[in-house]
Structure formats: structure tokens, C-alpha cells
Amino acid sequence: LILALSLTVASAAFAVTKVGVMTGTTSQGEEEYQAAQEMIRKYPGRIIHVTYPDKFMDEQETTIQQILSMAADPDVKAIALVQGVPGTAAAIDKVKEIRPDMFFINIVPHEDPMLSAQKADLVLETDNPKRGVTIVELAHRMGAKTFVHISFPRHMSYPLLSERRDIMKAECEKRGMEWVFVNAPDPTGDAGIAGAQQFILEDVPRQVEKYGKDTAFFSTNCGMQEPLIRSVLTTGAIYPEQCCPSPYHGYPGALGIEIPEGKAGDVAFILDAITEKVVAGGGAGRFATWKIPINMAFTYASVEYGFDLADGKIKGVDIEHMKALLTKHAGNAQFSTYNNVATGEKADNFLLVVGESIIFGGK
């Protein structure tokens, strides 16, 4: 494959430019996968789409090979990694050896934040430290007296996620809310995604029985969102936000919402459909998300950025241009750049985003 990269670089002149996109499968990241499919339809013949394996922790070499396969096409000028699972930094190094001109956008990095910023040209992520405040604040406003945070050791080894957890705990204490941390099975482990989902279906009723209906649930994993939404609605508890906030993340599958072909990407339609289902299920005022599909917006903006770069409309890292594209796809959002208060480390190419919340059936 490395040899193929070397042989094909020289033949790039005058070809149609392309952008590579790596996403999870429909099991691990349905929203990102569908966003990539939408880009394929929008830019026929100009998008190379690959997926990383569901058990990406054990199959990092597969992830690396998938990224290398996109870079082997000399017409690919930029690659968006949605999400930047382990193996991403090593893959970028390998590609840059042969294609130093390749532009990488790392979306939702799983590896060390500073390492991610050093390897990729641009990094995009929700502002997890700030969300540590806003999610608990929203849950409290929705009537939560207890906050249940569901995760597993691998996710808690990620600096931004562990920092957010600590902030959430402090915010709960500040508001007089009980803080509960629940260790769930890792979906990349032996039990797989099915085992993690089954745990959610069994554990949520136990927690509600113990702490009461005014309990807010938050999980750090994409694959857990559908069973979590379903269980919270059934038990009458509170669901303030997904790990990757978006009206498309978890809600349609959990609530049985069919999206007609003509309504794909129609955010107003999906917000109304969710509201109708939540209200009918007795969850009015107790379910929320962001008004924008953030990981889809990250994907759309990154693909457009890649084409703008390849077509000479911009050069290199242009944070303001990325902000403009994100505003186009995500609406009103707050932006900041990575700043680790504890270590003093900063990364100007690491853009953090917070969107606006909507409470379904709420006042």
C-alpha cells in the first residue's frame, strides 16, 4: 500500500479533486455514516468513504490501513476522520511520509488532545468541559435531583471526557444534586455493542427504582443512546443530552420515527416528530438535545472545507473559514479553542463548539 501511494502521487495533475471521509459503521456511528452517504450523493464521484471497525481498540491496524487506502488515491486532497479513533495519529504519520500535502481534519478525537492537534491540521470537537456545566444545568432546570453518568474505563482515560466528568460532579454538588457514576460494559469489549445496550435496558429501571423519576441519565457512548432514550421514557426519568448532541442521534431509532426521503436533513421535521413522540410517551419537558446535528455538521463542514482547500479558495488552516462553514450547517453556536487549564497547553487549530438546546414539549 505504501508503494501504491508512492506510485500514484505523480499522476495527480488535472484530475477531479476528491475528499476522503472515514466514519464508524451504522452500529457505532449511524449519524456520521449517513452524513458521509449524503456527501456522496451531493458530490458524486468525489467522495471516498471508508469505515473504521466496531472493535476499533483491538483493530487499530485496520483503521490505519483504511486511512492509507484513501490517501492512495492521488485525487484525494483532504481527509475527514469522523471519529478520530485510536490509530489515527499513527495513520496520519504514515500518510504524511508519502503525502506531506494531505490535509487532515480530525473530528471528535479519541487520542490525547495535544497529540491530535499536533498530527492533524484541524481538530473539531464539542466543548466537553463547557458541556460539563451546561448539561447538569439543563438537567437541573428539567427537575433532576440525581444525575447518573454512565461510562467505562476506556472513555474515562480520555482527558476531555474525564475533565467533563469532574466538572459535572462539581456542578451537581453546587446544585445539591446527587451524583452517581455507573460503570457499563465497553461496547468494544467481549460483550460488544449488544451487551452494552442490554446493560442499559436492565440498569436504568434499577437506578430509577433506587433514586426516583427525577433522575437524569447521561452516557458517553453513541451505541448506548437508543436503549437509554427508550428506557428513560418508559421509566419517566430525565434525558438532557446525548454524548454527541443532535436530534438525529438515538431519537429516531429509539422512538420509531421514520424519516421520509423528502424530509432527510429537514431539522424542523425531526424536531416536531420527536416532540410528538416524547409528549405522547409522557416525557414532555424531560427530554432535550441540541437544535443542530453537531457531528453531521462537523462532517458537512469538513467536506466543504476540503473541497475549498483543494480548489484553491483557501490555504491551509483557516479557522474563520471553518467557523463560517460550521455556522452555515450548525446555526448559532459558540466557538472556542482548546485550552487545558490544568497544564496550560493550548492548540489554536483545535476548535470547540457548543450548540443551543431544545427541550421537547417544554415551556
Name these PLM-found stretches:
Residues 168-179, 226-311:
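Extracellular/periplasmic periplasmic-binding protein-like sensory domains
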